[in-house]
Amino acid sequence: MSFDHLLTSSKRRELLQNLGIGHGSDVFSTGLFRKAECNAETAISQRSIPRANPDHLRPIFDRFATKEIKGKKLMTPEDFIRGYLGLYTEENYNKETVRLLASAADTTKDGDISFEEFCAFEALLCSPDALYLTAFELFDRNASDTISCDEFEAVIRHTQPLHDQDFDFSSEFIKRYFGADKQRNVNYHSFCQLLHDFYEEQGIQAFKRYDKNGNGTISSLDFQQIMTTVKGHLLTDFVRHNLIAVSGGGASGHKFSDTRGGFVTFPYYAAFNSLLAKMELIKRVYVSTTRGNLDIEMTKEEFLHAIQSYTQVTPYEVEILFHLSELNHPGRKTLCLKDIQAIDPERLKRVSQMDRLINIKAVHHKDDRGVGTAFLESAYRFLLGSVAGACGATAVYPIDLVKTRMQNQRTSGSFVGEVMYKNSLDCFKKVVKFEGLLGLYRGLLPQIVGVAPEKAIKLTMNDYMRDKFTKDGKIPLYGEIIAGGTGGMCQVVFTNPLEIVKIRLQTAGEVQQAGKKIGVFTVLKELGFLGLYKGSRACFLRDIPFSAIYFPAYAHAKLASADEDGMNSPGTLFASAFIAGVPAAGLVTPADVIKTRLQVAARAGQTTYNGVIDCARKLIKEEGPMSLWKGTAARVCRSSPQFAVTLLTYEVLQRLFYVDFAGSRPTGSELATTKTIQDESSTNPDHVGGYKLAAATFSGIEHKFGLFLPKFETSK
């Protein structure tokens, strides 16, 4: 919807008419209704929740409407608020509050809600500024499209803060909005600004009331009284319980010059309230600076540097913020997400760029994690790692076969026809020519069976060890290296037996033996149990350095390629995993060559090797130092895409099949953002369309604007 023109109150009601009733209705042409035109198609694009079909709303309305006049069903305020929305269901509910809330839907202000009004309010709740529109309807008591001073005062005096702290409705603040004689009415946009500024003015008046000497100071107890009555909607339990301590009236050792001796100056009072009102901005600065890593703790100096581009936040407010943070964890002068959430009642939610196929919250809080939860988390990672490993291995298996053939090719000795392949491309062509396309996948089954647990245990152990080394959201480089190396070491117990079987099958096609078909069981019978671990030292020599190089490189590549919110798209995940594989695969090629020579079955006339050192010595002596780097290109071309596919699949699966164990998540997989009103939508099947947000909207009016309405009738 275009807002190039001023959205006046009358135009707003026109929008409600067209959205709520549809074409052909003349209901809004009678009585106190205003009628006009609206581009409903453009309005639809602005709604964050789909509109309900009036045909679906009709039976719902008829079921809850208990009043009937001349054959037309109507909802009373009690029908709408208590019956349909399920609010204020207590026996001693405040009747004026229920009537006032229902008046938001009662466009004619006649005390009842018709079906047309019911539909119109559903449309209003779908609009982007539903919070302010609903508040405007609460104050517009005579359906005039404007708010008079008397209307504003009547509603404000019914709110809970005015029961505890009076307000001067003859002040200059009120006169600036309603005129010196208070006879000027305000329209919708002016009302929005009035509502925004009112509670700041109310706080100033409350301060003046307690500042009896007029010297700009109040006591800590007076400060607590003002904050709990006038500013109660800004307080969490943590802040409410620490008001005396933070204002210098308690035992806290941290005292500001403006809060010494149990007194609070107006600058401190203003900065404190301003900070609470800006907590949403504080949260955004923290999330942006930490690049989505919500476990990082920031120092005051780091935070001051981060807010340099935000002129709205003053150093005084930051000082108060870190004082509150220190009260949350005495002895540590840092700021973390827990501190922000202790100060700000609005919670962050974590969202992914992908729609989750599964969304399970296994643990509601990190403190609830136990041994069983940690085990389930590792099992979850192991399962996804197995699938990811199988995908990665299948994708690059032909390259792996070429690499193995090239590394096993001898370039010296008397064996006739030993040099079969000129290079990797020649090897690929000859395999396809003499063994067919399926020859490129010879030995794939044991490879998949092996790679599934191999990659799973490597990924799981790396994640597990990274969790152990991570403190305050940060992990040192040596911790990353040890975590990666541990993952590589643990995988060898799975890798070695399956690698040797894979290599025997991959090289079996080079020289065919008449009448002898070589399969998995043939190789197992020939090797025996101990033979399956032949060359295990070379496996350790290859896999530990590879993982110690790969995982830190991958983590840093992800961080470098993340967007400003710390998010990694599938493209950057693949690129990061691919790039990390180049140095990791290339630098450990000598160990891979030695492992291959030890595990392959030597044919008649070929050199045999007795261990890692003997193999390395004979290779250098017989084939030259460069023989240790045979197949480097093929290995890099195989390992880089394999791990790129594996890590991409592993992280994407964690996003699609989301299970929250209250532990660490892969960096860059989630964006931390504030919960919106849509996150509080009703699950009641009768609450369709905009009515999913009705209760959350009324609650938002209370907590955003401080319009706390009394729930119960007061005794006379």
From Swiss-Prot:
The keyword Transmembrane applies. SUPFAM superfamilies: EF-hand, Mitochondrial carrier. The chain crosses the membrane at residues 382-399, 443-462, 485-498, 535-554, 574-591, 631-650. It comes from the Eukaryota. PROSITE patterns: EF_HAND_1, EF_HAND_2, SOLCAR. One of its GO terms (biological process) is malate-aspartate shuttle. Ca(2+) 1 binds at D106, T108, D110, E117. Residues 1-345 are annotated as: N-terminal domain. It is a multi-pass membrane protein. Upon calcium binding, the EF-hand-containing regulatory N-terminal domain binds to the C-terminal domain, opening a vestibule which allows the substrates to be translocated through the carrier domain. In the absence of calcium, the linker loop domain may close the vestibule, which may prevent substrates from entering the carrier domain. Binds to one calcium ion with high affinity. Belongs to the mitochondrial carrier (TC 2.A.29) family. This is Probable calcium-binding mitochondrial carrier K02F3.2. It comes from Caenorhabditis elegans.
